[in-house]
């Protein structure tokens, strides 16, 4: 069967949930026995989000091949249970970079390079490069209809319908239908104007997905269908839900997957959603609960820790407990108030990050967790801070620090990696202080050897694993490993050549583990990551002791 394309646009305002809608539709199609792939087109000019402020963009999601991508790719991977790559996220910056590179190379034979056809052709090439024999390709266009940056992308997908045939392309438009509590009614005018804007570009949506606080009644759906020139049965409610994992079931109950199958002439198959029903039953009927303190500096924007948040929820599902998340600003933690700040936390997690702001608060929180036998999980910078804390307070190296925060220090147990072996390219990578910031870290999936008899081994159940990385600083193994091991630190995960330390533990602690990689990027609701599963288990045991 020829690949069918579903393009998902958004109107009225941003952050409506296009990514979750696309992921949920993909999950429904897979539940019907289809194969599916998915892509995010981002109109911003950045080549990728790797150097963007988390407060502006949210989390940077890393794929196996080392691509720094939009956080929506995390939703895609979790819902579709697939591994994506660089080709699944394309930005305006990358599009223009590719076109300019071709122009400099002479590929356009001296022609005038223009938005149409050169930019739009590059976008179309990116879209057509996504499917690899899958039945369906879902393409989400970031931003909002009407944004000037998004116009080339909308023009490109308009052209694709003519080129691929209307029977192979479906347009879904997600829009807002606000509910006015004071009047007790919903308003359709924003949706009408959004569709009008989209149609003025030449795109006539086939399905309208209406985000709303309340279920839309038949009269409202009929009105939207009339004014937006779509079939009545092509208007669906995307009602707010308590858990994002209810969305596939909500869309199924609306009949969205059935309508898509009819419009694209997909094979009629039953939709097996048993795993999603079981997941939601566990979320709604926990046997207990636990509270995790997340100590970071981006706590005012939860999107900065999106995959982390979800991975902790997955760990709760695996243990059939509700996970309450308490975000604690590391800049506000001091030795005097740390007990108060972390009171009631059954486990403490310090996530990744960059820069020295709030680092001492993280180290203080780690010391509290270690000394009071509170389960601790450190990720990336969190592991580095754990090593610094252990070196200072157990090994007695009071000046222990990171080269990132104290470049001239003599006791930097964490240092800038200037050389490492890339197992994918079979080449040695080299970096220095003057290297560009963008795309120069140790990125993507790397192998790791897990040491037997450790908590890491108990979690994974195997000695060889692959995990995703995003860092440029590393444990200074050559200079400090022997001293730290003698002081009781366990190096429980190493790179295959044993040059890099990937996991550390404290042996005389119920559960104290730090990892240099980002395990949250390989967790999904049906299969919690082993480390998150065991961290939540240890936190529950701490609560119940």
Curated annotation (Swiss-Prot):
Binding site for Mg(2+): 72, 140
Binding site for L-glutamine: 353, 381-384, 404, 472
GO terms assigned for molecular function: ATP binding; CTP synthase activity; glutaminase activity; identical protein binding; metal ion binding
CDD domains cross-referenced by the UniProt entry: CTPS_N (cd03113), GATase1_CTP_Synthase (cd01746)
Keywords: ATP-binding, Glutamine amidotransferase, Ligase, Magnesium, Metal-binding, Nucleotide-binding, Pyrimidine biosynthesis
Catalytic machinery residues: 380 (nucleophile), 518, 520
Keyword flag ATP-binding: yes
Domain Glutamine amidotransferase type-1: 291-545
Enzyme class: ligase
GO cellular component, one term: cytosol
Binding site for CTP: 14, 147-149, 187-192, 223
Catalytic activity, EC: 6.3.4.2
Activity regulation, free text: Allosterically activated by GTP, when glutamine is the substrate; GTP has no effect on the reaction when ammonia is the substrate. The allosteric effector GTP functions by stabilizing the protein conformation that binds the tetrahedral intermediate(s) formed during glutamine hydrolysis. Inhibited by the product CTP, via allosteric rather than competitive inhibition.
Family: Belongs to the CTP synthase family.
HAMAP family: PyrG
Subunit structure: Homotetramer.
Name of the protein described by the UniProt record: CTP synthase
Protein source organism: Maridesulfovibrio salexigens (strain ATCC 14822 / DSM 2638 / NCIMB 8403 / VKM B-1763)
């Amino acid at each position: 069967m020829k690949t069918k394309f579903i393009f998902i646009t958004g109107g009225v305002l941003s952050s409506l949930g296009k990514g979750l809608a696309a992921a949920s539709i993909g999950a429904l199609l897979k539940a019907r026995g289809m194969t599916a792939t998915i892509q995010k087109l981002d109109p911003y000019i950045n080549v990728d989000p790797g150097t963007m402020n988390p407060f502006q963009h949210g989390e940077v999601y890393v794929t196996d091949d080392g691509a720094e991508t939009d956080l929506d790719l995390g939703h895609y991977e979790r819902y579709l249970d697939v591994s994506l790559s660089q080709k699944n996220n394309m930005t305006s910056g990358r599009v223009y970079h590719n076109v300019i590179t071709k122009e400099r190379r002479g590929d356009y034979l001296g022609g005038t390079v223009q938005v149409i056809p050169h930019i739009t052709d590059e976008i179309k090439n990116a879209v057509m490069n996504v499917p690899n024999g899958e039945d369906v390709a879902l393409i989400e266009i970031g931003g909002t209809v009407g944004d000037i940056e998004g116009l080339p992308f909308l023009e490109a997908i308009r052209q694709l319908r003519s080129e691929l045939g209307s029977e192979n392309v479906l347009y879904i438009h997600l829009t807002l239908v606000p509910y006015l509590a004071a009047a007790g009614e919903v308003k359709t005018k924003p949706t009408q104007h959004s569709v009008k804007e989209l149609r003025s570009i030449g795109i006539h949506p086939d399905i309208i997905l209406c985000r709303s606080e309340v279920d839309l009644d038949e009269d409202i759906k009929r009105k939207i269908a009339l004014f937006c020139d779509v079939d009545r049965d092509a208007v669906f409610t995307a009602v707010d839900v308590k858990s994002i994992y209810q969305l596939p079931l909500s869309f199924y109950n609306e009949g969205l997957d059935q309508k898509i199958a009819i419009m694209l002439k997909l094979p009629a198959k039953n939709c097996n959603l048993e795993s999603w029903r079981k997941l939601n039953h566990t979320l709604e009927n926990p046997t207990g609960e636990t509270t995790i303190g997340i100590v970071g500096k981006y706590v005012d924007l939860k999107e900065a820790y999106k995959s982390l948040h979800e991975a902790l929820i997955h760990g709760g599902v695996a243990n059939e407990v509700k996970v309450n998340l308490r975000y604690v600003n590391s800049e506000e933690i001091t030795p005097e108030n740390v007990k108060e700040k972390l009171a009631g936390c059954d486990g403490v997690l310090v996530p990744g990050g960059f820069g020295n702001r709030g680092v001492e608060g993280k180290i203080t929180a780690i010391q509290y967790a270690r000394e009071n036998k509170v389960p601790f999980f450190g990720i990336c910078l969190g592991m580095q801070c754990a090593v610094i804390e252990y070196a200072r307070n157990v090994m007695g190296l009071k000046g222990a620090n990171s080269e990132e925060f104290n470049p001239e220090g003599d006791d930097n147990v964490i240092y800038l990696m200037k050389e490492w072996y890339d197992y994918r390219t079979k080449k040695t990578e080299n970096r220095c202080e003057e290297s560009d910031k963008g795309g120069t870290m140790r990125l993507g999936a790397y192998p790791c050897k897990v040491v037997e008899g450790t908590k890491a081994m108990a979690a994974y159940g195997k000695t060889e694993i692959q995990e995703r990385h995003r860092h440029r600083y590393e444990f200074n193994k050559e200079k400090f490993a022997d001293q730290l091991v003698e002081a009781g630190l366990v190096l429980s995960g190493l790179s295959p050549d044993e040059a890099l330390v990937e996991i550390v533990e404290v042996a005389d602690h119920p559960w104290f583990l730090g990892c240099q990689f980002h395990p949250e990027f390989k967790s999904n609701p049906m299969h919690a990551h082993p480390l998150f599963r065991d961290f939540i288990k240890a936190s529950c045991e701490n609560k119940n002791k």
